[in-house]
């Protein structure tokens, strides 16, 4: 039984921080923020306006506004369309004017992402706001919202568990059916069918849904993205199986590996180092450790084994509600909106532990899994082993 999400409590967390920052209203444009507050799947450009007190208002395409309203916890949903009086920003400005906020302090979501368009406020939208309200003060709310989102509540953690369980199930079905001669897209379809049957709402990633890479496509240098193709899987290939599920808008991300037939000595050596590195990474994700410390420990291990050049220099990323919450990446660097090496792991954070170890001409292996940070260590939400499966079919 899933824990019931407390959307009132979520709203109050945001409004409390708005009060501390002196923000009168927050314009939330990120898909993840809209989902966190309203609880509905909003595939379109949706913008929520959150007042410092009272319920939020969501503006979304009119062709989907009734469905979104039905699925949302808060029912204040307004349909928009490119028609006089119905345009999104025309209606948002009207909402703010009615509340006397022409000279107010307005929060917006500014920033960028290294991996995808995170639906931050667009430059053109920012210009509309500044031109309409030249005396208003606009504050970037992205940082304090990220601080709220990074600590998960009970309902979020339960949804992560369900998404992880669905990914584990999908992997199990794939490993039972995987055989030489299948195409990568066929394998992706097997995974997708199994996970949809188990309740997954979306193969959420923009990297090809269920990522399947085989042979040379599994071992691109630093290659961490394998959208499936019509390539046929051959004997001797290693195969990356990177599966994605969604449950109550919360995401599952599981990557494991298979080898078609008896591994070569070089494949076995890489596999042994890969498995040892996976275990070290999992052991390193514990409260009190910084992202930079975890990355340094992994880099040192890769140096000792002589495989540093083949390891993607990032050992995990955030995960959350639809929109991904990818920030921050587990690296010992600090680039605004991308990485934060001094960030400390805390209980109730959920991190994707990730390892990409690719040696072109030999094999490439990938591990991803959701990990809950606990007060004493961590809990892997995916339960499947790190060792590559040997497939003799």
Regions of interest found by a model, annotated:
Residues 1-393:
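Active-site neighborhoods and metal-handling regions in enzymes and metal-associated proteins
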């Amino acid at each position: 039984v899933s824990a019931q999400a407390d959307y009132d409590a979520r709203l109050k967390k945001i409004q409390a921080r708005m009060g501390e920052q002196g923000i009168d209203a927050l314009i939330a444009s990120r898909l993840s923020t809209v989902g966190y507050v309203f609880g509905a799947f909003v595939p379109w450009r949706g913008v929520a306006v959150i007042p410092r007190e009272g319920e939020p208002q969501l503006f979304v395409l009119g062709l989907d506004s009734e469905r979104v309203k039905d699925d949302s916890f808060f029912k204040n949903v307004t349909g928009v369309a490119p028609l006089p009086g119905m345009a999104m920003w025309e209606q948002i400005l009207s909402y703010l004017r009615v509340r006397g906020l022409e000279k107010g302090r307005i929060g917006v979501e500014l920033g960028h992402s290294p991996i995808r368009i995170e639906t931050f406020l667009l430059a053109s939208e920012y210009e509309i706001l500044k031109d309409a309200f030249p005396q208003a003060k606009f504050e970037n709310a992205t940082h304090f919202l990220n601080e709220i989102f990074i600590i998960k509540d009970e309902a979020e953690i339960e949804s992560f568990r369900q998404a992880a369980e669905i990914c584990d199930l999908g992997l199990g079905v794939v490993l039972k059916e995987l055989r030489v001669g299948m195409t990568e897209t066929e394998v992706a379809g097997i995974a997708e069918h199994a996970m949809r049957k188990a309740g997954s709402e979306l193969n959420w990633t923009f990297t090809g849904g269920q990522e399947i890479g085989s042979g040379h496509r599994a071992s691109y240098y630093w290659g961490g993205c394998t959208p499936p193709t019509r390539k046929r899987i051959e004997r001797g290939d290693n195969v990356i199986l990177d599966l994605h599920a969604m449950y109550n808008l919360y995401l599952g991300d599981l990557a494991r590996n298979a080898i078609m037939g008896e591994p070569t000595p070089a494949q076995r050596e890489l596999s042994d180092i890969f498995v040892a590195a996976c275990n070290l990474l999992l052991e390193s994700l514990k409260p009190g450790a910084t992202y930079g410390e975890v990355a340094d420990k992994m880099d040192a291990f890769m140096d000792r084994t002589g495989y540093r050049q083949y390891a993607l220099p990032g050992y995990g990323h955030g995960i959350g509600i639809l929109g991904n919450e990818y920030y921050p990446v587990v690296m010992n660097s600090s680039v605004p909106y991308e990485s934060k090496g001094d960030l400390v792991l805390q209980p109730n954070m959920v991190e994707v532990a990730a390892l990409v170890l690719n040696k072109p001409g030999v094999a490439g292996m990938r591990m991803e899994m959701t990990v809950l940070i606990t007060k004493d260590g961590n809990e892997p939400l995916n339960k499947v082993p790190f060792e590559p499966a040997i497939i003799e079919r």
